[in-house]
């Protein structure tokens, strides 16, 4: 594509990996899962050379002991890339795509590998069986770059009152959102359960989903032996699920590097725009509990930069740790809450691998947009308690 500026950032490869062996000790460690996902991304691009030529290897922080996994991966692929390790936050993957795109555009990077993995499911089950999955030892080392900034998101007064986890906050956001719409409790529970049933149907068709068991709105809504009430109105089937083994990877590079590696133009996906934003860190300091000024500003700005309106966006994947996160984002961006708002099936069913879910959503979106050439896709990302946000619009 000689008409494209050589410094144009393009997403050329997306790979996902999932494992659920009958014997958990047969599972591979997260580092090996990352390698599998990166190789799948390179194969998706049709160019293993991208792994050899990478200038940056960025890893989304996970629940594992590696201090600089990017260096271990760099050594396996035999490249001399600069390594990066992110801070915590579900906003991280989209934020890294935004950062990579800017650096590529500015000539500060050529080929950026973005990857993350979690092996919580196998590790837990191996431990219950008195076994241990061996992890690669890494001498204490530091990445070339720490990506992002850790922020304190719980005020001491909030902690004193037991507000320390997402499940303490998001049900309150849900009730506040219901009240803002004037819904009764029962109307609201019915509507949210019906929305989550749609997410479940999408997940059942996604080969990389962790949970692919069909659930009706009634089954999602009502507590039961396998679906306990976690925080009203949320049952277990409305909560993010991180008890899983999943990995995902993206390869973002310059148009020039894509051509040099022999990546066919039909694999290219263009980041049309990307934005980041943040709400007030402490929930107790916010003006209300049913809105997000940062999503409104950063989300709409992403659309403005891409030159699209909500009605122009064909495919959407909103961060879906809990239903309130989806509804608040959809409302602030004027997308509406009645359309399909997931491509994966969401963090309950497709899976919520801690900080790395959005790597999966972008990877899934890549396949959707290639199948629907010329269409526009939106991915949103959320970290904390509707605190840290990132947005990306993509098209072929």
Protein language model regions, located:
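Short beta->alpha junction loops
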Residues: 85-91
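C-terminal catalytic subdomain
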Residues: 351, 355-396
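Conserved "HGTGT" condensation-loop signature of ketosynthase/thiolase-family condensing enzymes
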Residues: 1-85, 102-109, 116-244, 248-250, ...
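Short acidic donor-binding loop at the edge of a beta-strand
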Residues: 110-111, 376
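A glycine-rich, Thr/Ser-enriched phosphate-binding loop motif common to dinucleotide/cofactor-binding enzymes
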Residues: 92-94, 294, 356-360
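Conserved phosphate-binding catalytic cores of ATP/NTP-utilizing and phosphoryl-transfer enzymes
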Residues: 94-102
């Amino acid at each position: 594509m000689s008409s494209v500026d050589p410094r144009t950032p393009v997403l050329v490869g997306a790979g996902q990996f999932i494992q659920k062996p009958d014997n958990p000790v047969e599972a591979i460690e997260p580092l090996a899962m990352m390698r599998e996902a990166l190789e799948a991304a390179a194969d998706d691009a049709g160019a293993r050379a991208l792994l050899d030529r990478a200038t940056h290897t960025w890893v989304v922080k996970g629940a594992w002991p590696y201090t600089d996994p990017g260096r271990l991966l760099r050594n396996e692929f035999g490249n001399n890339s600069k390594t990066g390790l992110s801070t915590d936050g579900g906003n991280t993957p989209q934020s890294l795509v935004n950062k990579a795109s800017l650096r590529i555009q500015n000539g500060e990077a050529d080929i950026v590998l973005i990857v993350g993995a979690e092996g919580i499911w196998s590790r837990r089950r191996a431990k219950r069986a008195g076994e241990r999955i061996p992890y690669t030892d890494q001498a204490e080392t530091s990445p070339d770059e720490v990506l992002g900034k850790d922020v304190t998101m719980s005020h001491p007064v909030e902690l004193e009152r037991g507000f320390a986890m997402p499940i303490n906050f998001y049900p309150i956001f849900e009730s506040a959102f219901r009240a803002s719409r004037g819904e009764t409790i029962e109307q609201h529970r019915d509507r949210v359960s019906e929305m989550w049933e749609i997410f479940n149907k999408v997940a059942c068709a996604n080969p990389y989903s962790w949970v692919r068991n069909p659930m009706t709105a009634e089954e999602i809504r009502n507590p039961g032996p396998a679906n306990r009430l976690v925080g009203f109105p949320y049952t277990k089937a409305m909560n993010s699920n991180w008890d899983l083994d999943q990995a995902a990877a993206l390869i973002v590079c310059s148009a020039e590097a894509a051509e040099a590696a022999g990546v066919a133009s039909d694999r290219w996906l263009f980041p049309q725009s990307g934005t980041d934003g943040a709400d007030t860190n402490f929930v107790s300091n916010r003006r209300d509990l049913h809105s997000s000024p940062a999503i409104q500003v950063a989300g709409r700005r992403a659309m403005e930069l891409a030159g699209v309106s909500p009605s122009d966006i064909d495919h959407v994947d909103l961060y879906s740790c809990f239903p309130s996160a989806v509804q608040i984002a959809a409302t602030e961006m004027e997308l509406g809450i009645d359309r399909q708002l997931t491509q994966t099936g969401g963090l309950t069913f497709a899976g919520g691998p801690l900080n790395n879910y959005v790597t999966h959503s972008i990877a899934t979106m890549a396949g959707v947009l290639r199948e629907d050439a010329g269409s526009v896709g939106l991915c949103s990302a959320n970290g904390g308690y509707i605190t840290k946000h990132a947005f990306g619009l993509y098209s072929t």
